[in-house]
Curated annotation (Swiss-Prot):
SMART domains (UniProt xref): EFh
One Gene Ontology cellular component: actin cytoskeleton
One example of a Gene Ontology biological process annotation: cell motility
Domain EF-hand: from-to ranges: 4-39, 40-75, 80-115, 118-153
Organism: Dictyostelium discoideum (Social amoeba)
Residues binding Ca(2+) 4: D131, D133, D135, E142
InterPro entries documented for this protein: EF-hand-dom_pair, EF_Hand_1_Ca_BS, EF_hand_dom
UniProt GO molecular function: actin filament binding; calcium ion binding; calcium-dependent protein binding
Gene: cbpA
Protein name: Calcium-binding protein A
Binding site residues for Ca(2+) 2: D53, D55, D57, E64
Record flagged with keyword Repeat: yes
Amino acid sequence: MDCAITKDVEDMLRKFDSNGDGNITFDEAVKRLKETGSKDPLRAASSMFISLDKDKDGIISIKEIHGHKADVAAKKLQKAINNICNNFLKGYDTDKDGRISWDEVCNWVNKNNPDAIAPLMIVENFFSELDKDNDRFVTKCELQEYVTKYKSLPEQ
């Protein structure tokens, strides 16, 4: 588990778990929200339980808090990957069909690296890294798989 997520979970428990049992009850949530000046503590607690009490037992457990924090982190990561891939597509996908063709990469290399000693090798390397179905097109899905695996895209 990510250290930041663990710290967030511990902070939340410390603030809301008044009896120290490692769980947050609805009453504990309402009490804490009142103490912090919430305008509508019942509504805020209800919202909190809708989001966090996955098994609907009326108690938010440390496991549920960890799961929620991990879900939020995963969504942020997926959004970042999506943004990286969209920006990468913008740089190469000149015909705006949502994929990068062999010709688009050749044109990009010739335009942006005119002194390249082996431009065809650059294009071949690009496609060998990204084009998993060998159709001479790189799709957003292929970009996302690559970024998810390697945390970046190849540089040209």
